């Protein structure tokens, strides 16, 4: 289900964003988002752990916060996960199946849909990184991340999400 959601969203999001009256694109996004929502039952991971804590403290929009944090966490999670990366890239119809290309394409999509580069751009200060990381470590979504994370790694992920810039 998650892969089908990914196919639909990667296909229809740019169209729905640029042509909001395109009913077929909006329908594709509707089905994709429903499938993604059902996929949450398998677990959420670090993107949501961090986003839950950022949203709780800074009242940020959860979807926007997730989008900003996503490439940072993907860089952490996808290292050494070549078969999973290839499956995701194939479902996004990418010719190159590397983690770098996958993340680059996600960042390009973020740029085309006006998603900020980092959490700092939506008002999250760098000095909260340690506190947010500690809270995110005990969030239930952390336990379902495909890769274990230490507090130091979590803090680095939070800091990068706050001040990092997209590579594309």
How would you name each of these model-derived features?
Residues 1-42, 146:
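Carboxylate- and glycine-rich phosphate/diphosphate-binding segment that chelates Mg2+/Mn2+
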Residues 34-66, 139-144:
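Glycine-rich phosphate/pyrophosphate-binding beta-alpha loops
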Residues 57-128, 167:
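Gly/Pro-rich interdomain helix-loop hinge
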Residues 17-20, 40, 44, 78, ...:
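Residues at alpha-helix boundaries and short interhelical turns
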Residues 126-168:
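Short, amphipathic C-terminal "tail helix"
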Residues 3-14, 30-34, 47, 51, ...:
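Predominant activation on well-ordered alpha-helical scaffold segments within soluble catalytic domains
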């Amino acid at each position: 289900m998650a892969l089908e959601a990914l196919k639909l969203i990667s296909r229809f999001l740019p169209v729905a964003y640029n042509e909001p009256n395109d009913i077929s694109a909006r329908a594709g996004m509707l089905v994709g988002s429903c499938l993604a929502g059902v996929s949450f039952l398998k677990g959420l991971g670090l993107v949501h752990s961090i986003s839950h804590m950022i949203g709780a403290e800074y009242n940020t929009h959860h979807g926007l916060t997730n989008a900003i944090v996503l490439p940072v966490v993907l860089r952490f999670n996808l290292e050494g996960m070549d078969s999973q990366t290839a499956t995701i890239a194939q479902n996004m119809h990418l010719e190159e199946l590397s983690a770098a290309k996958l993340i680059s394409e996600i960042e390009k999509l973020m740029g085309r849909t006006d998603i900020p580069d980092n959490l700092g751009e939506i008002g999250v200060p760098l000095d909260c990184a340690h506190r947010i990381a500690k809270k995110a470590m005990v969030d239930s979504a952390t336990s379902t991340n495909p890769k274990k994370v230490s507090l130091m790694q979590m803090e680095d992920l939070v800091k990068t999400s706050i001040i990092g810039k997209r590579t594309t």
